[in-house]
From Swiss-Prot:
GO biological process, one term: glutathione metabolic process
E.C. no: 6.4.1.8
Record key words, sorted: ATP-binding, Cytoplasm, Ligase, Nucleotide-binding
The name this protein goes by in its record: Acetophenone carboxylase gamma subunit
One CC-aspect GO term: cytosol
UniProt subunit comment: Acetophenone carboxylase consists of five subunits; a heterooctameric subcomplex of two alpha (Apc1), two beta (Apc2), two gamma (Apc3) and two delta (Apc4) subunits assembles with the epsilon (Apc5) subunit in an unknown stoichiometry.
InterPro entries per UniProt: ACX-like_C (IPR049517), ApcC (IPR050000), Hydant_A_N (IPR008040), Hydantoinase_A (IPR002821), Oxoprolinase-like (IPR045079)
Highest taxon of the lineage: Bacteria
Subcellular location: Cytoplasm
Species for this entry: Aromatoleum aromaticum (strain DSM 19018 / LMG 30748 / EbN1)
Family, per entry: Belongs to the HyuA family.
Cofactor(s) needed: Mg(2+); Mn(2+)
Pfam family, one: Hydant_A_N
Coiled coil (UniProt feature): none
Length: 732
């Protein structure tokens, strides 16, 4: 795999499996080619190979001719979430410390609302806690105890372990999770339990079971979250092995022998068969976020809102100072809080497939969060769908051309879309069909714009300081409505498959976390009292583990860069801030000061300088080692300006309805692929691309820059609103 890190161009395939479409990006001989296929939920490997076939068609190669030329495949998938939602996992047994058998059943107070939609949270009185993934009779305690310092308080009773293990096996357990108190401080007991399981049920026994140790999955504090992370990994391990194994077998049968990497929600990629299931959740949106950060840096945009409008959801995240700074430390997967640090993206149930309906009162229109998916899909797909969606509204409004949708490979039935909107929306509300379609579009745009406003304002930023990267199949179609106060929106030629394109520039990244609580700055005195030896020993242990894993994957250790991130907080506060340490080791008070200053700067940006609390001291909670092995990245193309006239891309005119004027208009239509750098189009206009449509409303202007990107801006921008300081906004 070391060949992937050299500076020579590599050929790659990047695939992102979404709820509605499977996106494909092929980088071959330095050029990019994109394709899109419907997702096949019953067997994701079918959609995977369909996408590869569609990509091969772009370069005139069959799958068997294309795959042997590929060096690397990167994959982001929803397979883990699909299996979890369908509860397709084995019966799991849990061995935990005696007296703590009910910890994951009790959960945390927030578990009543974890994973619930806003409407469900408002009606919490009728909500039930989620059914556990492990039955109560398959959770047994063993006699042992390690304290918070890692010292053995009660030795492990090995005979008790053997007895409890046999009980679990007799009750039908087909996978074992071992999660003991404070095992991340001292994993000796967990390791010995695994040895006992292997002694009792050897690899060649029919009763052999996989074993997941919590300290191996998450070496961090948090009993409930650490245990649930291990449980999810054990629950999904076998089904993911089968699904991904089936895809791998098909790839090898068709001649592929390169690297197969999985996109991680931590912002990198790693060997697919060495990836914990919990690291695959939300991989697609994270790839889009990383792609946004990369292109923001290359194009000179400091602050970017990454907005991904797919068929099922709208994912939004921020790039600040050309980098990703926001993480979620205890994300909720389905209904369970886990202890996996993910790059933070916010998801709302708004997308091209979002279903519109009139509520029970008959007076209010709702759009989302339910989605029609790819099967049966929107009504206009003519595949049996009966409920109108956002895509149906876009077709009725005249924005999407039914004859050229999906590159002309999926003709749309406009008449059925009109009928569904008329009968299900317009008639119940007592309005015209076209008004109903415009209302559907308005509501979904406002839902997405509100998500952006919340994310920007709640972090103390000003929308006018940002640029919107609009991507996903429906992103360019709706960007004018969702950008709000953001002055500029950018559309990439690969916008419909941007998450897959984002993964094409992702490095190989391994992350290692270790909880070690230390006093960094003494309360009251503001003196640095961090234990240098303990600090450096923790870092060195993680570095050595990283080097061993890099060698085992065939990667050159000399190619890797090591970065340290620290989870720190002020005394008397509860909010941890993950900061990038300027140093790997601390050897002097001057080193400690440099680390603290970096923490104070990032803390102030995140929470406001008004809540910096040096007298309360500073505490270090967790170490994170980020190991990056860079991969080759294709250059961003640059074209000479060709003038403002877009007539070479003109396709003709077609009627479209514009709510801004409340009239139909013969609207100029252009072909995106034929536009040249420097071309300018004033709205109203429609720009068709192979896999998406750019809508340019009245009083908006679309221009093509020197990189072939489409830039949407207001012709007469509104005067800027009165600003409040970022600090004040953060407090509000």
């Amino acid at each position: 795999m070391s060949s992937l890190t050299n500076q020579d161009a590599i050929n790659s395939i990047d695939i992102d499996v979404g709820g509605t479409f499977t996106d494909f990006v092929l980088t071959l001989d330095g050029e990019r080619h994109i394709a899109k296929c419907p997702t096949t939920p019953h067997d994701l490997s079918i959609g995977f190979l369909n996408a590869v076939e569609a990509g091969g068609d772009k370069v005139g190669l069959s799958v068997e001719e294309l795959l042997p030329r590929i060096d690397i495949i990167r994959y982001s998938t929803t397979v883990a979430l699909n299996r979890l939602l369908q509860r397709q996992g084995p019966r799991i047994g849990l061995l935990t410390t005696e007296g703590h058998e009910d910890a994951i059943l009790i959960g945390r107070g927030a578990q009543w609302t974890d994973g619930q939609r806003v409407a469900e949270r408002r009606n919490i009185a009728v909500q039930n806690k989620p059914l556990p993934l492990i039955e109560r009779d398959l959770i047994l305690g063993v006699r042992e105890r390690i304290d918070s310092s890692g010292s053995v308080v009660r030795p492990l009773d090995e005979e008790d372990v053997r007895t409890k293990l046999r009980m679990l096996m007799d009750r039908g357990a087909r996978a074992i999770v071992v999660s003991l108190l404070w095992s991340f401080m001292n994993p000796a007991h967990e390791k010995r339990v695994r040895e006992i399981i292997r002694e009792e049920y050897k690899e060649y026994h029919i009763g052999f079971v996989p074993v997941v140790m919590s300290h191996s999955v998450v070496s961090k504090i948090g009993e409930y979250e650490r245990t649930m992370t291990a449980v999810l990994d054990a629950y999904l391990q076998r089904s993911m092995q089968n699904d991904i194994g089936a895809t791998w077998d098909k790839l090898r049968a068709k001649g592929y022998h390169g690297a197969f990497l999985m996109i991680h929600n931590s912002g990198g990629s790693a060997d697919i068969f060495k990836t914990p299931a919990s690291r695959t959740f939300n991989g697609g949106p994270v790839a889009g976020l990383m792609g946004s950060a990369y292109f923001a840096n290359k194009l000179g945009y400091k602050n970017v809102v990454a907005g991904d409008v797919g068929g099922t959801s709208f994912d939004v995240a921020l790039v600040v100072e050309s980098s990703v700074r926001n993480y979620t430390f205890r994300p909720v997967i389905d209904k369970w809080m886990v202890n996996v640090t993910m790059m933070q993206t916010i998801s709302v149930g708004s997308g091209g497939g979002s279903i519109a309906k009139v509520d029970r009162s008959g007076t209010r229109l709702e759009v989302g969060p339910r989605s029609a998916g790819s099967m049966p899909g929107p009504v206009c797909y003519d595949l049996g769908g009966t409920e109108p969606t956002v895509t149906d509204a876009d077709v009725v409004l005249g924005y999407i051309n039914p004859d050229t949708y999906y590159g002309g490979r999926m003709p749309l039935n406009k008449a059925k879309a009109e009928k569904a909107i008329r009968e299900k929306i317009a008639q119940p509300l007592g309005i015209e069909t076209i008004e109903a379609a415009a209302l559907i579009r308005y509501i979904v745009d406002e839902n997405m714009a509100s998500a952006i406003k919340r994310e920007v304002h709640m972090r103390g930023y000003h929308p006018e300081d940002f640029v919107l990267f609009a991507f996903g199949g429906a992103g360019p179609t709706h960007m004018a409505g969702l950008k709000g106060d953001i002055p500029k929106a950018v559309v990439f030629p690969a916008a419909p498959v941007f998450c897959a394109m984002g993964s094409s520039i992702m490095d190989i990244v391994h992350m290692y976390e270790q909880s070690r609580r230390m006093v960094f700055m003494e309360p009251g005195t503001e003196k640095f009292v961090v234990d240098y030896e303990h600090f450096n020993q923790t870092v060195d242990t993680m570095i050595e583990r990283a080097r061993q894993e890099l060698r085992s994957e065939g990667l050159e250790v000399d190619d890797a860069s090591f970065g340290l991130e620290l989870d720190m907080l002020y005394g008397g506060q509860v909010n941890l801030k993950r900061m990038s340490s300027p140093l790997l080791h601390i050897r002097t008070a001057e080193d400690a000061l440099k680390v603290y200053q970096a923490f104070e700067t990032e803390f102030s940006e995140a929470f406001s300088p008004l809540v910096v609390n040096k007298p309360g001291g500073v505490f270090l909670d967790n170490f994170v080692l980020r190991v990056t092995v860079p991969t080759w990245k294709p250059p961003i193309p640059e074209y000479p300006l060709q003038g403002t006239d877009p007539s070479a891309a003109f396709l003709g005119k077609r009627k479209a309805y514009w709510p801004e004027t409340k009239h139909w208009a013969d609207t100029p239509t252009y072909q995106f692929e034929l536009l040249q750098a420097g071309n300018v189009i004033d709205g109203p206009a429609i720009v068709e691309a192979e896999l998406t449509t750019i809508v340019v409303p009245p009083r908006q202007r679309l221009s093509i820059d020197t990189h072939g990107l489409a830039i949407l801006e207001a012709i007469d921008p509104a005067p800027p609103t009165k600003r409040v300081s970022a600090a004040a906004a953060a407090i509000v």
